[in-house]
Amino acid sequence: MSARDIDATVLNQTVPMRVDILEAGAPGRDAAEAFIHSHYAQAYGADIRHFLPRLMVLHAADGELLATLGFRRARNDRLFLEQYLDMPIETQLALKLGYYSRRYEMVEVGNLVTRKPGGARWLIAALTAYLKGAGYEWAVFTAVRQLRNAFARLSVELVPLGPADKSRLDAQEQILWGKYYET
């Protein structure tokens, strides 16, 4: 086997071939949630029990699940990350930017898990295209180092709004998140 054959084999195993958006009850949703749960348990000792309403799932050509991320429209729902803020996300963002953004133009992103390096960048690119096509202007999220790095590699500028303070969660929720807040 030549070096070129090896490279092609590696690419065939790691280049995403399909992106799906799964809502509750959709085929494959349970597997995606189990994938997220397992990753957070291994990485942070967390016991994730709630998943965002829509999961974007990245599959390799052979069907292997490579990465997931979830998102929720801000229009009608309180966002998980608003627990860390003293005001609604649109007000916090307006104070930071100097102009007002409408809540219905925002989505919250979370449940990010990648099996292989680079998976986050593929999903972020796919999510960006999807959200732009759907008329969204802002994706808001709590960013661990891995996510900040993925955005940096894509030359996406982040607008920090404040720290994710674990003490703002109720006691049970703090336990469920394990060591996540230490990253």
Please report, for each region that a protein language model flagged, where it lies by residue.
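Intrinsically disordered, low-complexity, charge-dense segments enriched in Lys/Arg
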Residues: 2-10
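Short alpha-helical hairpin
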Residues: 12-14
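Generic preference for hydrophobic/aromatic residues in regular secondary structure cores
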Residues: 17-21, 71, 158-160, 164, ...
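Alpha-helix boundary/capping detector
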Residues: 58, 62, 135, 157, ...
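Acyl-donor binding region in acyl/amide transferases
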Residues: 82-171
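A conserved beta-strand-loop-helix scaffold within acyl/acetyltransferase catalytic domains
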Residues: 16-104, 110
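Compositionally biased, intrinsically disordered low-complexity regions enriched in proline and serine
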Residues: 41, 85, 137, 181-182
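Accessory, usually C-terminal, subdomains that scaffold auxiliary metal cofactors
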Residues: 165-183
